A protein has these predicted regions:
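Domain-level recognition of nuclease-like catalytic cores that cleave nucleotide substrates
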Residues: 95-141
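Catalytic cores of nucleic-acid endonucleases
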Residues: 59-115
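Catalytic phosphate/metal-binding cores of nucleic-acid and nucleotide-processing enzymes, i.e., regions
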Residues: 18-25, 29, 41-43, 69-70, ...
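Acidic-and-aromatic substrate-binding clefts and catalytic sites of carbohydrate-active enzymes
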Residues: 37-41, 103-105
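Short, well-structured alpha-helical interface segments that form or flank functional binding sites
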Residues: 12, 43, 76-80
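Flexible, charged surface loops at secondary-structure boundaries
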Residues: 41, 49-51, 88-91
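Active-site beta-strand-loop-beta-strand hairpin of nuclease catalytic cores
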Residues: 46-61
Length: 141
């Protein structure tokens, strides 16, 4: 797959996650919504935010490498998303939603691996795993 395909696939994944949350929470969601974070406040664009500002979601459509290794740079980007979410008020439900991708060598998904190795950084950010083939979401941890 060419690198030019990745942004399109990421956008499709983001839309599917948005639809899942709308169907399962009965709320309206906005894609790429800016919210103020930090002090002094500066706008940051979050992938998906509930219209009533109660839920914020960052989507990560990452897979294992071709040789079934951890995509370590992408895990760093996921930590960055958690960092931004952590600046939102505690009134928000905060999620990182990852694509379900199974490593048969390790017998674990990338979201399971991420949670296992980074749960000490998560605070009140929840990790979820979305399977677009089955339209199923699973809370990790």
């Amino acid at each position: 797959m060419s690198n030019s395909e990745h942004p399109r696939l990421g956008a499709v994944f983001q839309k599917r996650v948005k639809q899942w949350f709308e169907e399962n929470t009965k709320k309206e969601f906005i894609i790429e919504k800016k919210l103020p974070i930090g002090n002094p406040p500066k706008d940051h664009k979050f992938d998906i935010v509930a219209a009533d500002d109660t839920i914020a979601i960052e989507c990560k459509r990452y897979t294992w490498t071709e040789t079934w290794n951890v995509p370590s740079a992408k895990m760093g980007t996921t930590n960055e998303a958690v960092f931004y979410l952590s600046f939102l008020p505690d009134t928000y439900e905060k999620y990182v939603v990852m694509l379900k991708t199974v490593n048969k060598k390790r017998n674990e998904t990338l979201a399971e691996y991420y949670y296992k190795t980074n749960r000490h950084l998560l605070g009140n950010v929840k990790v979820m795993e979305y399977d677009p083939e089955l339209d199923m979401m699973r809370l990790i941890g």
